[in-house]
Amino acid sequence: MDPIDNSSFEINYDHYGTMDPNIPADGIHLPKRQPGDVAALIIYSVVFLVGVPGNALVVWVTAFEARRAVNAIWFLNLAVADLLSCLALPVLFTTVLNHNYWYFDATACIVLPSLILLNMYASILLLATISADRFLLVFKPIWCQKVRGTGLAWMACGVAWVLALLLTIPSFVYREAYKDFYSEHTVCGINYGGGSFPKEKAVAILRLMVGFVLPLLTLNICYTFLLLRTWSRKATRSTKTLKVVMAVVICFFIFWLPYQVTGVMIAWLPPSSPTLKRVEKLNSLCVSLAYINCCVNPIIYVMAGQGFHGRLLRSLPSIIRNALSEDSVGRDSKTFTPSTTDTSTRKSQAV
C-alpha cells in the first residue's frame, strides 16, 4: 500500500489537528502553548459549566410544554442542538490541552468535532424557521389561527434537522485520524485527497453562504419588516417573543463571525503563506468563541423572563417558562391567544 501523502491533509477550521515541522520528532519537547489555545481552554470550561445545566434546564422546561405550545417546540430543538455540542466539549478540551493531538478513536474523530457544524446548521435553520413563524404571526394572523399548530412545528423542525445533517456530510466524509509525520502523534484532521484545494474552497463557500451570509440577509429583511410593523401599530403585546428571538439571532451571528472569517482565510491561503500560520494559531480560539453561542441562549431566556424583582422570587424553570411562553400577536387579531393557536381543539395538524 502506498504511504499516506501528508501534504493532502489541509488544516481547516472544522478540525483541531496541526502539523508543525518545528516540533521535535522524538515528541519529548512539546511546542509552546499559544495564547489563543489558553483562552480557548478557559472558554470551553465556562461554556461547559454553564451550557450543560442551562440547556438541560431549557430542555426539561420546554419538553413539558411542547405538546401544546409551538414556541416550546422551537426552543426545545434549539436547546437540544446546543446541549449536544456542549456534551462534546470535554473531548475538545482534552485535544487542545494536549497540543491538538488526538487520544481518542477514529469514530470519535469523525463524530465529535462535527457536532459543532451540526449545531451551526441546525441552529441557523431553526432560527430561520422561528423567524418565519414570527413573520407569519404578524402579517398572516388569520392564516396562522387556522393552520399553525404543534404538528406543523414538529415537521418544520424535522426538516431543519435533516438539512443540517446533510450539510454536515462533508465533515463526516473527509475527516479522519492519522499519524502526524513530524511528531508521530495521532491527529484528527481533514483529508480532501489529491487536488484538495478546490474541494476545500467549495466546502468553505458552502459553509459561509448557507451557514452565515444567506441567513444573515434573510433574517435582516425579516426583522426589519417585523420591527416596522410592530412600531407602526404599537403592538407591544406581541414583542416579548420577538425580542427573545432577535437577541438569540444577534448572538448567533456575533459568535460565529470569527469562525467563518478564519475558515475562509484558511481555505483560500496557500500552505506556504505566513498569514496562514498566524491564522491557524487563532483556530482554537475562534472555535471556542463559536461555542459560546451554545450557552448564551439560556441566559437570554432568564434575562427576558421577568423583571429583576421577579427573578428573585421565582424559580429558574418558571422564569424560562415565562420567557418562552406564547404571546398574542397584537391588534391585528382580536382573539389570537395560545388557546386559539396551540391547543388540540384546533383542526388536525397532520405532519
UniProtKB/Swiss-Prot annotation:
Similarity annotation: Belongs to the G-protein coupled receptor 1 family.
Positions in the Extracellular compartment: 1-37, 94-110, 175-201, 267-283
Biased composition (Low complexity): 335-351
Post-translational modification: Sulfation plays a critical role in the association of C5aR with C5a, but no significant role in the ability of the receptor to transduce a signal and mobilize calcium in response to a small peptide agonist.
Function according to Swiss-Prot or TrEMBL: Receptor for the chemotactic and inflammatory peptide anaphylatoxin C5a. The ligand interacts with at least two sites on the receptor: a high-affinity site on the extracellular N-terminus, and a second site in the transmembrane region which activates downstream signaling events. Receptor activation stimulates chemotaxis, granule enzyme release, intracellular calcium release and superoxide anion production.
Pfam name, any one: 7tm_1
Disulfides per UniProt: 109-188
Glycan-bearing residues: 6
Key words of the record: Cell membrane, Chemotaxis, Cytoplasmic vesicle, Disulfide bond, G-protein coupled receptor, Glycoprotein, Membrane, Phosphoprotein, Receptor, Sulfation, Transducer, Transmembrane, Transmembrane helix
Transmembrane segments: 38-64, 70-93, 111-132, 154-174, 202-227, 244-266, 284-304
Record InterPro entries: Anphylx_rcpt_C3a/C5a1-2, Formyl_rcpt-rel, GPCR_Rhodpsn, GPCR_Rhodpsn_7TM
Topological domain ranges for the Cytoplasmic compartment: 65-69, 133-153, 228-243, 305-351
Name listed for the protein in its UniProt record: C5a anaphylatoxin chemotactic receptor 1
PANTHER family the record matches: C5A ANAPHYLATOXIN CHEMOTACTIC RECEPTOR 1, CHEMOTACTIC RECEPTOR
